[in-house]
């Protein structure tokens, strides 16, 4: 599937506060060009979040309806969830700490300190924690915000640049020498993660994209001599 950058930028441009946050992010984030945890990854998450927001507003089979304020919290959380990511140099606990510090600095820079901003920071920080890996929050314990952020963090694997962006991006960040092992572990992670998806959007997207994804994944393995992984 293709990443619709226009949809993402349209929502950011139309909201002055999100626009300020995005400008802060691009000016202060030192991980924009990491092999995997980069700007493209973050924009890919935001696209899925926007789609979930739009679907929740127009479909009757959704158990929730997101308001514009919910969307802003989710976009802000996605924007900063990998802020100043270490790219494999440190644990994800450190990465999440960096993300929260970046978010706090952004909010204080734009708004100053107030009870309202402290509350916004608290909500976004808790949401961001859902992406710390290995996961520190069980799937069954996720709040709606946390579930949306975690599932969108995983759904980026369905973009057409998956092989070059995620497989080789992660390999470079992790300094991985055993591509066969990474190939197998990545498959196991994705299949397990997709089975745990609970959002209607995530389930439908996986159903529509899984055949293409798995076919490409197995062809990639065959080309490199890894063999086929069972579906």
Predicted feature locations:
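Acidic/His-rich, divalent-metal-binding segments that scaffold phosphate/diphosphate chemistry
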Residues: 1-90
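Divalent metal-dependent phosphate-bond-processing catalytic cores, especially two-metal-ion Mg2+/Mn2+ enzymes
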Residues: 1-8, 36-37, 50-68, 80, ...
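Exposed alpha-helical structural elements
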Residues: 4-7, 17-24, 119-123, 127, ...
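Histidine- and acidic-residue-rich, metal-dependent catalytic cores
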Residues: 42, 49, 95-138, 187-194
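Short capping loops/turns at secondary-structure boundaries
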Residues: 69, 76, 92-96, 117, ...
């Amino acid at each position: 599937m293709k990443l619709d950058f226009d949809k993402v930028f349209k929502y950011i441009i139309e909201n002055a506060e999100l626009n300020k946050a995005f400008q802060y992010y691009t000016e202060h984030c030192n991980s924009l060009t990491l092999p995997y945890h980069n700007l493209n990854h973050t924009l890919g998450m935001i696209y899925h979040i926007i789609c979930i927001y739009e679907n929740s507003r127009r479909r009757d089979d959704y158990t929730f309806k997101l308001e514009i304020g919910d969307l802003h919290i989710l976009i802000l959380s996605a924007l900063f969830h990998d802020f100043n990511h270490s790219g494999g140099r440190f644990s994800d606990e450190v990465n999440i700490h960096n993300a929260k510090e970046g978010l706090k600095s952004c909010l204080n820079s734009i708004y100053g300190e107030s009870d309202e901003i402290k509350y916004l920071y608290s909500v976004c920080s808790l949401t961001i924690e859902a992406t710390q890996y290995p996961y520190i929050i069980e799937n069954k314990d996720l709040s709606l915000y946390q579930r949306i952020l975690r599932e969108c963090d995983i759904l980026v694997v369905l973009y057409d640049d998956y092989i070059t962006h995620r497989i080789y991006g992660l390999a470079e960040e992790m300094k991985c020498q055993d591509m066969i092992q990474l190939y197998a572990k990545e498959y196991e992670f994705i299949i397990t993660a997709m089975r745990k998806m609970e959002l209607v959007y995530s389930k439908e997207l996986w159903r529509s994209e899984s055949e293409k994804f798995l076919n490409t994944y197995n062809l990639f393995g065959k080309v490199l001599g890894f063999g086929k992984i069972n579906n």
